[in-house]
């Protein structure tokens, strides 16, 4: 959809939106842009897990999720992060709606590898009808990084991968993957642009590592699907642009 911007909010931004972030969203909406927000909540999940003396383990940047962890993740994403983000946006006169009952119907997922990751999903399909209905009414949908499989089981999904799938399904003009760092760093400097053909080598050489791997992989997938721009950074305007080439 023309004029659609998908914003993935993660890290510190997922706990508290800055005034600059709110102002930029307001400007885009005033200019006729339609916005979808996808969020993670790793910091809150880590805190809740720590309070319960439960271990946190990641493989290739993805959180290993036991079935018993899911209520905690739901509490963090739906009960805390998503609710707070939606309240902040609405308080700033940005009409928003947190997807709760519609989330599983919108995000269809399946296990990535249950033996390795547990209840971690990969997106199989995004049912866009409800999202399009909200966007047509000038409402910002707010999606937590969760989905359901065919058996109705809840799966934890990496928020970068989910945002990429949403952007691709809506054929958005831009995807922004917000994080706590300014962009992809090489020799302590932000790379202004990375071409899709350079990604494999930068992963092999360790320039792209840890939690940045799923961000870059989702960015590449999104660019190749026809989405105009993918930006990785700590704000809505600057960072590392992922481009086809």
Curated annotation (Swiss-Prot):
Keywords: Amino-acid biosynthesis, Arginine biosynthesis, ATP-binding, Cytoplasm, Kinase, Nucleotide-binding, Transferase. Its EC number is 2.7.2.8. GO terms for cellular component: cytoplasm. The keyword Lipoprotein does not apply. One of its GO terms (molecular function) is ATP binding. The keyword Aminoacyl-tRNA synthetase does not apply. The record marks 8, 215 as: Transition state stabilizer. Belongs to the acetylglutamate kinase family. ArgB subfamily. HAMAP family: ArgB. Catalyzes the ATP-dependent phosphorylation of N-acetyl-L-glutamate. This is Acetylglutamate kinase.
């Amino acid at each position: 959809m023309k004029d659609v911007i998908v914003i993935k909010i993660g890290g510190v931004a997922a706990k508290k939106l800055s005034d600059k972030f709110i102002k930029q969203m307001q400007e885009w909406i005033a200019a006729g842009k339609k916005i979808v927000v996808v969020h993670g909540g790793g910091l809150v999940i880590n805190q809740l897990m720590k309070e319960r003396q439960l271990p946190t383990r990641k493989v290739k940047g993805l959180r290993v999720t036991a079935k018993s962890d899911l209520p905690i993740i739901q509490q963090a994403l739906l009960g805390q992060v998503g609710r707070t983000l939606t309240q902040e946006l609405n308080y700033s006169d940005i009409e928003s709606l947190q997807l709760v009952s519609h989330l599983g119907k919108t995000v269809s997922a399946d296990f990535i590898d249950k033996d390795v990751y547990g209840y971690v999903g990969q997106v199989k399909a995004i049912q866009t009808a409800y999202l399009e209905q909200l966007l047509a009414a000038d409402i910002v949908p707010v999606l937590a990084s969760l989905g359901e499989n065919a058996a109705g089981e809840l799966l934890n999904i990496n928020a970068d991968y989910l945002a990429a799938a949403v952007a691709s399904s809506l054929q958005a003009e831009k995807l922004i993957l917000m994080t706590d760092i300014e962009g992809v760093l090489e020799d302590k400097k932000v790379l202004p642009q990375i071409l899709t053909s350079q990604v494999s080598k930068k992963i092999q050489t360790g320039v792209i590592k840890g939690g940045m791997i799923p961000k870059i992989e989702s960015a590449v997938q999104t660019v190749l699907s026809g989405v105009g721009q993918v930006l990785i950074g700590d704000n809505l305007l600057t960072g590392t642009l992922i481009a086809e080439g």
